[in-house]
């Protein structure tokens, strides 16, 4: 999962392109954290798909700043929601930020075996 965090951070833009879930999917796939390209369309659906199809578990963490590096944070809000990966210096999806998303955190997900 550390590799996914590094890939996400390296591919992120300074500002949002409104494609957070696409960039997180690509980082997870390139890192080998998922066996295929996730099929859900909306960021708010990411947690359900990662747990049901790819062996991720939902962590009992409710503060995004306490999420382990490499974990996937899923938020509701803004219609489609938002998803980002915790990095060593903050958070990354289609953009990088030192601050977590302000939407309501749905869950923090990690693949414990990877």
Where in this protein do the model-derived segments appear?
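...with weaker cross-activation on analogous glycine-rich loops/strands in unrelated enzymes
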Residues: 36-104
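N-terminal capping segments
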Residues: 1-48
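C-terminal partner/receptor-binding element of secreted or periplasmic proteins
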Residues: 100-114
